[in-house]
Each structure stands twice: as C-alpha cells, then as structure tokens.
C-alpha cells in the first residue's frame, strides 16, 4: 500500500526500491533481478504486465517471495501463475480513510490442510477484516445480508482507525457517513468463513432488469483466457434492461482475433447465467488507466457509444431471468 509500505519496510529494516511513476514491465523485471526484491506491492495490472513480459523473456524471479495486491481484484489465474513460480500473492483491501488497511486474505488455520483449489478460492478474495474494524454489508433495502457468499451489498465500516469525516467537505460527509459508519462505496459479499469479496464499486455494478451483475467477476473470468492480455467490463445504457454489460478486451499478441470472441463467450457460458454474458466484446489496444494503474471505466464510457456497442443485439437475447 502506498501509505503503509514505506513505514513497514523501514520498521523491518528493509531496503526500499522505487520504480518511479510510470514503470513498464521491463523496468520492474530488471529491478527485481538487480536489487533482489523480496516483497513488492501494486495493483493487478502491474503484475499482469509482468506476467506477459516473463512469458516472452527470460526473467529471474527467484528472489521474490511475496506480492501484495490491492486497488482491484486479482484474477485467480494470476495468483496461480505466480504460485507456480514460488511467489505468494497476498490480497489486501483498504482505503485512505481507514489508515489504510481493512482486510488481508491470509488463510485461517483450519484451511491450511485444505486442497489447493479451496485455498485459491479464499486467496482470491479480499480476506478477513483486521482486528479493531467493525463492518456490515447493506443491501438496497438497508438490510444486512447473509454471510453466504452469494448475496451482496455495500460495505460499511467503523473503528478507531477510521476517519469520522472529511475536512471541509460537508456534502461528502453527509453522503458517505451515517451514525459513525463509513460507506465505502464497495459492493461485496461475505462467505461463512468471514472472507469478504469485492464484487464491484457501487458506481460500476451493472444493474440489468432488476438484477445486479458484477463487472469485476466477469473481468477476472475473461482475463483467465490465455489469449487475453487485459479486459474490463462496463455497463452501457439499454432501452429495456436499464444496463447491459460490454467487455473491452486487449488480445495478447499471439491471439487469433477471429476466434477469440467465441472462446471468451464459451468460457463465460460455463460459469455464468445467460443474462450475465456481455452483449458485445470490443477489441482495444489498451485499457485506459488512472494514475495508480487502475482501469478507468469512466474514460471508456466517454469514448464509446452504448448504442453502437449494442447494435445488432435484440433485447431478449440477454434478458435477465431468461437463462436456459
């Protein structure tokens, strides 16, 4: 974490290695090799880029023990790739307002002997809340959801390390704080073991025909395809269903673009109901990113027309509740 790492590294007596404001995968690979980096952190797009670079170049990652991932969800395919090279990927979640850590996805002791796929499922989530943080998850009806890993709602948190208000921002304070609780803006689910999973940002969750679709879950599934370099999913306006998902995909250099779209759809059909499937897949050269490396869905919405993206799809093709 940009706030926490300098302090923890110093407290541990570790050397700091800073890659600069806009490092590319080659720079990161070089620093890991030459500086003997053991622990590093960054958003998933950084490590997806490193993965692709390593596939085409000989890179020595033997010094690297752990990657801490935050900012957005890491695809399980990414965690598996680094596991196969002896590098642990540790999910964490937090906010500046939380000073900054909220949860860490370490395995509970009763899961240490579980099978790899079970452990991977837990490690692919944002984890368990750190001590001192109280939380609840609220649905559209202001009711707390069940801890079943299926229902989801907005995550609210409170605790001694969480700010109680913003400085001189009365409108934001009224919107984001209620009775001592901070409304995080993250839509999450929580499983019976207490592991939270970020489903989406509240502003990015796709509302289609009265149902919610997780753009993050679709993105991670698409990026599990071997011929996909990057992918993001946004909701575009739809006359009948309110919104429908559209996927923006950056094909890997080796990809056959003529068959990739059907390959992606086949992958999604095996995992998700019909009404979750994207109404369109657009190939792009690069997903726009924010200054911190997160995907900028706002830029995509501004660049592309929903009418054009959904052209040719009849409304009933992806109707919620019309799954086979």
Kindly give the residue locations of the regions a language model identified.
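Conserved beta-loop-beta connector loops within the AMP-binding
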Residues: 132-156, 192-193, 255-261, 296
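AMP-dependent adenylate-forming
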Residues: 204, 262, 297-312, 316, ...
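Conserved AMP-binding/adenylation subdomain of ANL enzymes
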Residues: 1-38, 53
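AMP-binding/adenylate-forming catalytic domain of the ANL superfamily
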Residues: 272-294, 312-321
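AMP-binding/adenylate-forming catalytic core of the ANL superfamily
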Residues: 40, 159, 164-165, 187-276, ...
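Active-site glycine-centered loops adjacent to acidic/histidine catalytic or metal-binding residues
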Residues: 71, 94, 127, 186, ...
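Conserved ATP/PPi-binding loop(s) of AMP-dependent carboxylate-activating enzymes
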Residues: 111, 128-132, 143-175, 211-213
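Gly/Ser/Thr-rich phosphate-binding loop
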Residues: 11-14, 34-42, 48-121, 134, ...
């Amino acid at each position: 974490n940009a706030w926490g790492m300098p302090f923890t590294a110093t407290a541990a007596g570790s050397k700091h290695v800073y890659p600069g404001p806009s490092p590319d995968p080659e720079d990161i690979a070089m620093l890991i090799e030459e500086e003997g980096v053991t622990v590093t952190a960054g958003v998933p797009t950084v490590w997806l880029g490193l993965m692709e670079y390593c596939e085409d170049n000989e890179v020595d990652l033997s010094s690297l023990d752990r990657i801490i991932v935050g900012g957005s969800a890491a695809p399980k395919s990414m965690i598996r790739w680094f596991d196969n090279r002896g590098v642990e990927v540790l999910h964490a979640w937090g906010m500046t307002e939380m000073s900054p850590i909220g949860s860490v996805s370490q395995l509970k002791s009763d899961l240490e002997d579980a099978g790899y796929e079970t452990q991977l499922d837990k490690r692919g989530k944002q984890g368990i809340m750190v001590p001192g943080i109280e939380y609840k998850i609220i649905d559209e009806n202001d009711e707390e959801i069940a801890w079943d890993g299926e229902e989801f709602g907005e995550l609210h948190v409170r605790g001694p390390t969480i700010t109680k208000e913003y400085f001189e921002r009365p409108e934001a304070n009224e919107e984001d704080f209620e009775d001592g609780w901070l409304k995080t803006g993250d839509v999450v689910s929580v499983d019976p073991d207490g592991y939270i999973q970020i489903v989406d940002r509240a502003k990015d969750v796709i509302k289609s025909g009265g149902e919610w679709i997780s753009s993050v879950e679709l993105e991670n599934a698409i990026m599990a395809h071997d011929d996909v370099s990057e992918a993001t999913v946004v909701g575009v306006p739809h006359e009948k269903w309110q919104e429908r998902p559209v996927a923006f995909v950056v094909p890997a250099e080796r990809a056959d673009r003529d068959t990739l779209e059907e390959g992606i759809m086949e992958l999604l059909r095996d995992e998700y109901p019909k009404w979750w499937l994207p109404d369109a897949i657009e190939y792009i050269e690069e997903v726009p990113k924010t200054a911190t490396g997160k995907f900028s869905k706002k830029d995509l919405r501004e660049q592309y027309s929903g009418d054009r993206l959904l052209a040719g799809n009849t409304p009933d093709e992806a109707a919620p509740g019309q799954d086979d």
